[in-house]
Amino acid sequence: MAQTGNFKSPARMSSLGQGAAPASAGAVTGGKPREEGLKGVDFERRGFLQKIVGGVGAVVAVSTLYPVVRYIVPPAKKIKIVNELAVGPASDVPNGTGKIYQFNDDKVIVVNHGGSLTAVSAICTHLGCLVHWDEAADMIACPCHGAKYTQDGKIISGPQPLPLKQYKVKIEDGKIVVSIA
C-alpha cells in the first residue's frame, strides 16, 4: 500500500533534489554527532535506575537487619578486672579435690592437696580445653588430648607447650581468695 499525502522519504528527497540533505546516522542537527558527544560516558538511564534501586534496597536491608542482629546477639558482658577476689567458701574444696572458679576473664582451678591450696589457670595451654583435678591420678588433667600437670601447673606430659598460669591463693575469713601472682 502506497503512502498518500505529503510524505517523502529522505532517499526520495535527495534524488529529487528537494529539501535539505538527509542527516547522517547518529548525528544531531546543529551539534556534534552522538558518538562524539557521549564519548567516555558509560551509563544509560536503565543502568542508572538499576543502581539507584539497588542502593535503596541495600539501605533498607541493612537498616532492617541491624536491629535484628543486635537483638539476637547479646552484648558482651564487661568483666571488671580485679587483683584479688574471694571466689567461694573454703569448705568448697575439701582435701584431695579441686574446683573451678571464674577469676577476671580466666577460669581458675583451686586444688586442695594435703591441706595446701594452689590455684592455676583451668585453661589448657594446648588448645584451650577446660582441665580438671584427677583425684585418682593426683594431678590436673586435660580431657581433650591427655595433657597432664602437677598441682602447681607444671607440665608432666602431653602436647601442651607451656605450664598453666599460676595464681596466689589464701584463705581469709573462711573464704578462698585468689589473686594475681
Curated annotation (Swiss-Prot):
Give the CC-aspect GO terms: plasma membrane
Q: Which reaction does it catalyse?
A: 2 oxidized [plastocyanin] + a plastoquinol + 2 H(+)(in) = 2 reduced [plastocyanin] + a plastoquinone + 4 H(+)(out)
The UniProt transmembrane annotation reads 53-73, 114-134
Q: Where in the cell is it found?
A: Cell inner membrane
Q: What class of enzyme is it?
A: translocase
SUPFAM superfamilies annotated for this entry?
ISP domain
List each copy of the Rieske domain by range: 85-178
User: Per the annotation, how and in what number is the cofactor bound?
Assistant: Binds 1 [2Fe-2S] cluster per subunit.
What Pfam families does this protein's entry cite?
Rieske
Topology in membrane: Multi-pass membrane protein
Cofactor section: [2Fe-2S] cluster
List ligand-binding residues for [2Fe-2S] cluster. Answer: 124, 126, 142, 145
Please list where the region (Disordered) is annotated: 1-35
List the cysteine pairs that form cystine.
129-144
As a miscellaneous remark, the entry gives: The Rieske protein is a high potential 2Fe-2S protein.
> What family is this?
Belongs to the Rieske iron-sulfur protein family.
Tell me what this protein is called.
Cytochrome b6-f complex iron-sulfur subunit
Q: Which organism is it from?
A: Chlorobaculum tepidum (strain ATCC 49652 / DSM 12025 / NBRC 103806 / TLS) (Chlorobium tepidum)
| Gene name as annotated | petC
